Amino acid sequence: MIVVTGIGIVSALGIGVQENYASLKSQKSGLDNIKNFQTTHNVPAGEVKYTNSQLKALLNLRESKTYSRTTLLGMLAAREAVQSANIGTGRVGLISATSVGGMDLTEVFYPSFEQGVTLDKVVHHDSADSTIHIAKDLKIEDFSTTISTA
């Protein structure tokens, strides 16, 4: 049996269910030019308006620790979902889905690959990495799995 008991959301419209709902009601668009990634393209996209450093601050995470953007966004949404569900400390599992995993860190790392740089950023590439960090953040020690949506 699957029971959905809470909701959390992070999107180009905002962070949290209330901010997203208010944005939808006021017909606000989340589309804008890309600002948080280096790109040669100047096209509108639905981008979460916070930098990774700002997301870490919202989550009270150490700035020096490396997390993929997928992990940071997932942590915010998952924390809200768990809080709205009022889940206790009983048997809790986590099913997380992602299409990009830690690709943002891999793309930054790749140009320096042939220069002998350490592989510490690449360990975050795997899709399951975000699920592992989210489960740890929520203190979920039971079942967890990752669905690749790519």
Q: What is the role of each PLM region?
A:
Residues 146-150:
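Short beta->alpha junction loops
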Residues 1-144:
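Conserved "HGTGT" condensation-loop signature of ketosynthase/thiolase-family condensing enzymes
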